[in-house]
Regions:
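A conserved hydrophobic secondary-structure block that centers on an alpha-helix together
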Residues: 85-94
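Surface-exposed loop/interface segments of Gram-negative outer-membrane beta-barrel transport/assembly proteins
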Residues: 1-77, 93-195
Length: 195
């Protein structure tokens, strides 16, 4: 009766597949607004139509079929609470929580992509972080003469957060579209590695 314990565990994993949502008009949403319905979708040979006289005039169907994005988010959270009644009116409480997250971002542009004309492009990056919080406090409550109440509280709190730890690579110039972002080593050119 004097000790109360509580534990909690929450885990989630999300997968998100989408088309590219790039900046400066190079997203499917933008292209659906500005691409003229009078322009053909494909050329007579089956390739995607592109009007070379207008800059940043991307064919939205080409973008849907040639530019891919896949993201994954993993999250884990653990919480615990202990409350101890030392005596009437005096309790001591301790809380601890830990959360961990990992985000994986992948995208690829095929060799036929209109948004990236470097014979295919791919990128993979992963970022992770964690956070810990510990707090402990005591409460004292005393009523005098059924009229006056004295309430005191004292405690300590500590927090640690580490985020943005990760790396990524961007590559270009593939022989074909078979590997996409799954094996960046097959590209002929590495633009950057971030860490």
């Amino acid at each position: 009766d004097r000790l109360n314990l509580a534990l909690g565990l929450n885990a989630s994993e999300d997968h998100f597949n989408s088309v590219a949502w790039n900046e400066e008009g190079a997203s499917v949403g933008d292209a659906m607004n500005y691409y003229s319905p009078l322009c053909p979708v494909t050329n007579s040979d089956g390739s995607w139509y592109k009007d070379l006289t207008i800059s940043q005039n991307y064919n939205p169907l080409s973008m849907i079929n040639e530019d891919k994005m896949n993201n994954q988010h993993h999250r884990l959270m653990f919480t615990t609470k202990a409350e101890f009644k030392i005596m009437t009116g005096l309790t001591w409480t301790a809380n601890y929580s830990y959360s961990n997250s990992q985000n994986i971002y992948n995208y690829s542009n095929s060799v036929n992509s209109q948004t990236d004309v470097r014979n295919g492009a791919a990128s993979r990056s992963i970022y992770q972080g964690h956070k810990q919080v510990f707090e402990t406090f005591g409460n004292f409550l005393k009523t005098f003469n059924k009229v006056h109440t004295l309430s005191l509280m004292g405690g300590y709190s500590w927090e640690e957060e580490h985020s943005g730890d990760g790396f990524g690579a961007k590559v270009f110039n593939f022989y074909n579209d078979q590997v996409g972002y799954n094996n960046l080593a097959y590209a002929n050119f590495i633009k950057s590695v971030d860490g």
